[in-house]
């Protein structure tokens, strides 16, 4: 049965979802209620991007940003080719990540190389970039609901102009737990570390995860 995501997000029109979802992600209690509802609606299956068809039908910016989304079979093939040809240490990079479909496929294939009781979120770290305002909330949600670790750059991969950057971390290091989120400060230090130039005045001071020293250490791993 097709999931009615507008009903789950409690909106009348799909254009309202990105802004509302972004606000929910910064409220731990509210987002975890949403996460559980999404998990139940998708039979607890986190192997793929649930929003692939919904986002492509309702939110894709095909004219302005030439957005199209990678089919699951292609994402699976790409992931397996990389893992088989080069080995895989769990570090993942993707520009133009969209809502995270290829990233999720890689994460899923990677975690399945471990026994369920042996895998820990610290074994996989994703560094992903995306330009679209509409995609970013879904990309963040997809990482957080799966208990992933990583950094999300909201900006232009080519010019390195960056509107915001987000640190996603599973502080319990437990793949049955959700991840938290911090907005990375717009400072010269982080511009240098992330190779970006912050250009947006819309910085939201949200540092729920940990002390900055811990963030620095993770960035320098």
Pin down the residues of each PLM region.
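Class I S-adenosyl-L-methionine-dependent methyltransferase catalytic core
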Residues: 1-221
């Amino acid at each position: 049965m097709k999931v009615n995501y507008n009903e789950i997000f409690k909106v009348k029109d799909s254009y309202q979802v990105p802004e509302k979802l972004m606000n929910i992600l910064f409220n731990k209690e509210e987002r975890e209620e949403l996460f559980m509802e999404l998990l139940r609606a998708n039979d607890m299956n986190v192997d793929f991007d649930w929003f692939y068809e919904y986002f492509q039908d309702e939110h894709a910016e095909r004219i302005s940003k030439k957005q199209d989304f990678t089919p699951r079979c292609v994402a699976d093939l790409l992931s397996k080719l990389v893992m088989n040809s080069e080995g895989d240490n769990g570090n993942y990079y993707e520009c133009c990540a969209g809502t995270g479909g290829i990233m999720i496929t890689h994460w899923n294939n990677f975690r399945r190389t471990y026994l369920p009781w042996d895998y820990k979120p610290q074994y996989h770290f994703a560094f992903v970039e995306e330009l679209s305002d509409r995609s970013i909330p879904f990309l963040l949600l997809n990482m957080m609901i799966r208990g992933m670790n990583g950094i999300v750059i909201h900006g232009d991969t080519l010019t390195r102009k960056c509107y915001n950057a987000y640190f996603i971390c599973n502080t319990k290091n437990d793949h049955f737990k959700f991840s938290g989120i911090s907005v990375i400060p717009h400072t010269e230090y982080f511009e240098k570390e992330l190779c970006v130039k912050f250009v947006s005045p819309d910085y939201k001071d949200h540092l729920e995860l940990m002390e900055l020293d811990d963030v620095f250490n993770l960035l320098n791993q």
